[in-house]
Regions:
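Aromatic-lined, polymer-binding surfaces characteristic
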Residues: 1-177
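Extended polysaccharide-engagement surfaces of secreted carbohydrate-active enzymes
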Residues: 177-234
Length: 234
């Protein structure tokens, strides 16, 4: 692929995870680095923050890389940031949902409605208040009906791509609760999140030799698998 200037790199995704972890563990990790060490990391991040991306949820990875750099005092290309943010807004389809490419699935929830609230905290509320307000409005709109995607036990209705992410669909509640004007019901959000976690962790086939298995349900038994699981709990 050498010489392909349109190529996007998977590392763009992973650098987003990296900056979130550095934010969460800021005092324990980031703040212990010297200025020179931080500069090395910042230069590494910049290569992906300003680099090529995929025109869908990936734009949020670039946005968070740049927002982290800005938050830590490094210069960023604000025009690129604005272009990404406006593009994300253009993917909005209504009722709290974003198109990811031409698809609707849980990526709208665990990507758009999680990374956008984090971006608001790091950058948007201060630097792009109009866009931040729209992200907040969209997340709050999703909260009006999103609980209906889970059953009475909080189990996730597996749908769309990457069911391997299992209970990640509940992260949209976490994203909303980060907002300045959150409308999520904290108690209901906790109940659903706990139930969805138990949906997988209480299964006999969740672990193999102590390590979580790949897939949603390894046996892919669907409804029967859920009934079997409930019978084991009684």
């Amino acid at each position: 692929m050498a010489g392909d200037y349109n190529r996007a790199f998977q590392q763009t995704v992973e650098t987003c995870a990296l900056v979130i972890c550095l934010w969460v563990c800021k005092e324990e990790i980031w703040d212990t680095y010297t200025k020179e060490e931080k500069d090395v990391i910042a230069e590494f991040l910049r290569g992906y923050a300003d680099g090529n991306t995929v025109p869908q949820n990936w734009r949020l990875f670039n946005m968070l890389d740049m927002a982290f750099l800005d938050m830590e005092g490094y210069e960023i290309d604000e025009e690129i940031m604005l272009d990404h943010a406006q593009s994300i807004l253009a993917y909005y389809a209504g009722d709290g949902w974003y198109r990811d490419g031409h698809s609707f699935d849980y990526y709208s929830c665990w990507a758009f409605n999680v990374y956008a609230p984090i971006w608001n905290l790091w950058y948007g509320y201060e630097k792009q208040p109009y866009i931040a307000a729209k992200f907040e409005e969209h997340s709050n709109k999703l909260m009006e009906t999103y609980a209906d995607f889970f059953d009475r036990d909080g189990f996730t209705n597996m749908w769309g791509r990457s069911n391997i992410y299992r209970n990640a669909a509940t992260s949209a509640f976490d994203g909303n609760l980060m907002l300045h004007n959150s409308t999520a019901d904290p108690g209901l959000a906790r109940r659903i999140s706990s139930g969805s976690l138990l949906q997988f962790m209480t299964r006999d086939d969740f672990l193999f030799k102590g390590v979580p298995t790949l897939g949603s349900y390894p046996s892919c038994r669907g409804r029967k698998g859920k009934e079997d699981q409930r019978s084991r709990r009684t």
